[in-house]
Each structure stands twice: as structure tokens, then as C-alpha cells.
């Protein structure tokens, strides 16, 4: 047994409202640079749909992920070393910019410099790649909310085998949202595909990163990743991908997409796994058994034998405590309601999903029946084959009974908790019907429905003694580069050349201090930083406004209109 730690995420798809807040904030934080205009580390897809890039799940075309060779051993679907060497200067399985979309801006100068005329000036779209006028034909979420579903959603590869049953008329279709980030797999095919060895998986927390210094822009990682979550920066000639916001995680903060999620659907936690089992379990022949095989790799943090092995492997005690409290471990192994995305790729992804019950509930509501009744929900899950089979194609390589079991648990939870919320005696036969007891089902409800911030994000901080092992951690002065303090080098392709902004863990430590502070304002040495999020609008918190000449120490808000003389009760 070789115990290793992995930071993982679970998303509850029933809570996703498709607002794209996670996508926008992620882009502003990580890819708001030249060369990454088309890059979305986080994107939200409407399903059924083509996804981003278009038809990325067609591995017969893109050759991503792993497959079993004639000897039953794992091999890259895109070929081994000889094939990659033969095509290293011209990768034939690269998605083109048309498979993503051509990024654009608008000619705003036409609007601002237009003289007074009888006609409204028009800002034409201009390509961010060529600078020429263009016609917008596609984008990262062009088919959002089933837009153009007759033409686009019908080409969704996950409808394979059930397409004759699916009708794309508005009255008969179904949909849900699927947020996607890098899976930070246990067996990443992108890392195995890189000829330069630039992609690596951190041993400390399992996050998969790209070493920008070693990357030579071969782009084999782009075609090797079956989820197409590795992108090529055409300004720097380097590959870039989701970083799981590692500088935030190192100080105990959740990722940007999780922090800003409106639906609070994301859970982040630590999972322990046996690294010696990964290759064996990923090589199982039956694709439908890969979900159970990956779960078999995970280790119970309450097992004394696992605890001893983890201590011998150098995993700190506070990380073991975080693993015991991990919501990800609970949703995957204790409640067994989370499923991996496309386990058939054999990469062992570590961003899991709770499949949505809403397509089934919506159908029951539309028929006028009670959508909270256990009998109605169970019958609908068995009768509505199209949504269930589609979810099985996404999350269990087509294993319908596993998806049905998860949906039955979610349906039972709805029915069981309705009785409790209405003051009725709880019906213990409801959780028993899905192999649970009432207390376990109530705990699952609390985690899925009303979990607090600290329950959804159980993130242990990095240890100082591991600082130099965390290769991307800034341990030198973050201002020491060409141009002086705060300046970036110009680079061969213009200012900054689209390079990522250097990060310093000190900045995220200050951010954590402000977000977890009990006071409205930061300490005296940073008095201008006021936490407006926790201000209820009553009174004037210290540091919000400059002091008035007539203010006294006991009345700092004297003379300010609307003040109540106190700093407010907070929120």
C-alpha cells in the first residue's frame, strides 16, 4: 500500500443554474491575457449538446485517453513514442480554432469617435487573432439552454444508441447544465503524452500542472487529454491548463470557481488513495466496472492500517483530519451518490458529479402528479429511460443500474425530508428501500442542501516544510523580474507575451485573513481594506471613510449623515 493524497471536487448538478459565474471569474483570474482569449479553464455546457470544444468526446477522432492493447495493458489511444516522434512537428489530431471558436472583440472606437449623424453607428466584430472583420459563427456556449438544439444537440455523442428515442421538440426534450474543469486525474494521459515531460502531477496534493519552462509547444497533451482541458497559448507557444487554483488551496482557500459559485454546488476535499492500485484498476477490461474500480483505489481515513501507512508516507496529521472530514470522501464512498465523468477514458478523473434528478422531477410535475412522492419518483426513474441512459453514457460508461441507484437515493431523500419538514413522523422504510438508515440520509441531506462554507470546503493548508517541494510556490521575491518592481518583461511577441502573472502565496494568505476575519475592517496597518460583504449598511465601520475633523475616538462617525454611531451588527 502506497498512500497518497489527492485534492478532489464534487459538483451537485441539480444545483447548477447555468449562470456561468464560475466561468467568468475563472477567466478573469487566470486567462484574461493575450493568447488565451479562447481558453476557458472552466466552462458550463448545456446537455444534450456538443460541449466545448465541439464533440470533444469523440475519441475515435481525437484519440484522447487510454485504451487496452492486445496484451491487455494500458496504452495511449493516440499512439506510443514512435508515433508521436513521427508526428511531433505536425500533430494530425489537433482540434482547430474552428472546433473551439475564433475569439472576437468589437470596433468600439467607431462608437466613441463617430460624429453626430441621423443613423446609429455600428461596432463590427473583429477577430482577436487576425484583427480583421469577421462573422460570428460559434462560441464557448453557443448552444446554451438548447439553443439551436435541432441542429446541434442531436449530434451529441452521448445520445448514441438512444437517438431514435430522443426528440428535440421543446415539449419533449430535457436538459441540464454540466460545469467542467480539468479532472486532475490519477492516471493523466496528458502527462503521458507530453514528449518534454512538462506536465507533472504534484505528489503532495495530486494537482496536475504544466511546467512553462520545460514546455516546448508540441501540443501532444492537447490531443492526449480526452476532456480537451489543455489549451495552447499561441502567443507564448506554451500549453496551459486549469491549475485547481493551487495558490489558494495552499493557504486553505477554495478555487475561484467554487468561491464564486451562485448555486453553491461545489465541494472540495481531500481523498486518500493507494497509488499501487491505480494501474491495476485502470486496466480492467470491462468499461462498466471502471467506476467501481476507481472507488476501490480510495482508502478509508478511519482505517487504522491506512493511518499508519499515511504516517509512514509523511502525510501530516492535519491532512489526515481533513481527509476524515472531507465532503468528497463522504459523497463518493459513504453515500455513494457521486460519479466520475467518462470513466471509460481510464484516466481516473478526480472531479466527480452528482447526477441531476431534475429531468425526472420536471416530467412528473408536468403530468400533475406529486413530484415529491417516493413511489412516483421511483416509477418515473424506471420509466424515463432517455434521461437515465444519457446520464449513464456520461458518468458510468453506459451502466444504467448504477445511475438508477443514485437517482433513487436522491429521490428517497426528497420524500423522506418532506415528511420531516412538514412535521410528520419520518418513514424509515424510505431510506431502507435504498439501503440507508434515517440518520445517514439526514446527514446526506444536510451536506447536499444546507452545508456551511466550512463543510463544503475542507482544505488543509500546505506545510512550510513542503514549500520547496511545491514547485510552483513562489519562495523568492515576486517582483524580481525584468523591468523592476511590478513590471513584466516585454517578450518577443509584445508586452508580456501573454505569460501568466506570477503568483505569490503571501497575497493569498492576506486574502484568506480578510475573508476569515471576524472584524469588518482589516488590522490597523491595512485600515483601508473593509469587508463590505459583511457590512449590513448600518453605521460606519472603521476605515470605510476618512476621519472627520470633528470626530472623537469614541465617535469616529460623528458628522456623517445616516450613521447610527456604531459599526452595525454585521452579517
Region locations from a protein language model:
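Non-ligating segments of multi-cofactor redox enzymes
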Residues: 1-571
Amino acid at each position: 500500500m502506497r498512500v497518497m493524497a489527492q485534492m478532489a471536487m464534487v459538483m451537485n448538478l441539480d444545483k447548477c443554474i447555468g449562470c456561468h459565474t464560475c466561468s467568468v471569474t475563472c477567466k478573469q483570474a487566470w486567462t484574461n491575457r493575450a493568447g488565451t482569449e479562447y481558453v476557458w479553464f472552466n466552462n458550463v455546457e448545456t446537455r444534450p449538446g456538443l460541449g466545448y470544444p465541439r464533440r470533444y468526446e469523440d475519441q475515435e477522432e481525437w484519440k484522447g485517453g487510454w485504451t487496452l492493447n492486445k496484451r491487455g495493458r494500458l496504452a495511449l489511444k493516440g499512439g506510443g513514442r514512435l508515433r508521436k516522434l513521427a508526428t511531433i512537428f505536425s500533430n494530425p489530431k489537433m482540434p482547430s480554432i474552428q472546433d473551439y471558436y475564433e475569439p472576437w472583440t468589437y470596433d468600439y472606437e467607431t462608437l466613441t469617435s463617430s460624429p453626430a449623424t441621423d443613423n446609429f453607428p455600428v461596432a463590427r466584430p473583429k477577430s482577436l487573432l487576425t484583427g480583421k472583420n469577421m462573422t460570428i459563427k460559434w462560441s464557448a456556449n453557443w448552444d446554451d439552454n438548447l439553443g439551436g438544439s435541432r441542429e446541434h444537440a442531436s449530434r451529441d455523442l452521448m445520445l448514441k444508441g438512444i437517438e431514435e428515442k430522443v426528440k428535440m421538440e421543446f415539449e419533449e426534450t430535457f436538459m441540464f447544465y454540466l460545469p467542467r474543469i480539468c479532472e486532475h486525474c490519477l492516471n493523466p494521459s496528458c502527462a503521458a503524452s507530453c514528449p518534454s515531460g512538462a506536465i507533472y502531477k504534484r505528489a503532495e496534493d495530486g494537482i496536475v500542472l504544466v511546467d512553462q519552462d520545460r514546455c516546448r509547444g508540441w501540443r501532444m497533451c492537447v490531443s492526449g487529454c480526452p476532456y480537451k482541458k489543455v489549451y495552447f497559448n499561441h502567443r507564448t507557444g506554451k500549453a496551459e491548463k486549469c491549475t485547481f487554483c493551487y495558490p489558494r488551496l495552499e493557504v486553505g482557500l477554495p478555487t475561484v470557481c467554487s468561491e464564486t459559485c451562485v448555486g453553491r454546488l461545489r465541494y472540495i476535499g481531500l481523498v486518500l488513495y493507494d497509488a499501487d492500485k491505480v494501474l491495476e484498476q485502470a486496466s480492467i477490461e470491462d468499461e462498466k466496472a471502471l467506476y467501481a474500480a476507481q472507488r476501490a483505489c480510495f482508502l478509508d481515513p478511519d482505517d487504522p492500517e491506512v493511518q499508519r501507512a499515511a504516517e509512514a508516507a509523511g502525510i501530516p496529521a492535519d491532512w489526515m483530519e481533513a481527509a476524515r472530514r472531507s465532503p468528497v470522501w463522504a459523497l463518493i464512498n459513504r453515500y455513494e451518490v457521486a460519479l466520475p465523468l467518462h470513466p471509460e477514458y481510464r484516466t481516473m478523473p478526480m472531479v466527480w458529479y452528482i447526477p441531476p434528478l431534475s429531468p425526472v422531477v420536471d416530467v412528473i410535475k408536468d403530468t400533475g402528479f406529486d413530484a415529491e412522492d417516493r413511489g412516483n419518483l421511483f416509477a418515473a426513474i424506471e420509466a424515463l429511460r432517455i434521461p437515465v441512459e444519457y446520464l449513464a453514457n456520461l458518468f458510468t460508461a453506459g451502466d444504467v443500474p448504477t445511475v438508477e441507484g443514485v437517482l433513487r437515493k436522491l429521490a428517497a431523500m426528497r420524500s423522506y425530508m418532506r415528511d420531516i419538514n412538514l412535521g410528520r413522523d419520518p418513514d424509515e422504510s424510505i431510506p431502507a428501500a435504498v439501503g440507508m438508515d434515517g440518520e445517514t440520509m439526514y446527514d446526506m441531506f444536510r451536506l447536499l442542501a444546507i452545508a456551511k462554507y466550512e463543510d463544503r470546503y475542507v482544505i488543509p493548508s500546505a506545510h512550510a516544510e513542503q514549500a520547496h517541494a511545491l514547485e510552483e510556490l513562489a519562495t523568492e521575491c515576486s517582483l524580481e523580474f525584468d523591468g523592476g518592481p511590478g513590471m513584466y518583461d516585454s517578450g518577443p511577441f509584445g508586452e508580456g507575451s501573454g505569460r501568466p502573472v506570477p503568483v505569490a502565496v503571501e497575497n493569498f494568505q492576506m486574502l484568506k485573513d480578510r475573508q476569515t476575519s471576524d472584524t469588518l475592517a482589516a488590522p490597523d496597518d491595512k485600515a483601508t481594506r473593509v469587508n463590505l460583504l459583511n457590512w449590513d449598511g448600518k453605521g460606519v465601520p472603521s476605515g470605510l471613510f476618512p476621519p472627520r475633523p470633528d470626530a472623537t475616538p469614541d465617535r469616529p462617525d460623528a458628522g456623517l449623515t445616516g450613521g447610527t454611531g456604531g459599526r452595525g451588527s454585521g452579517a
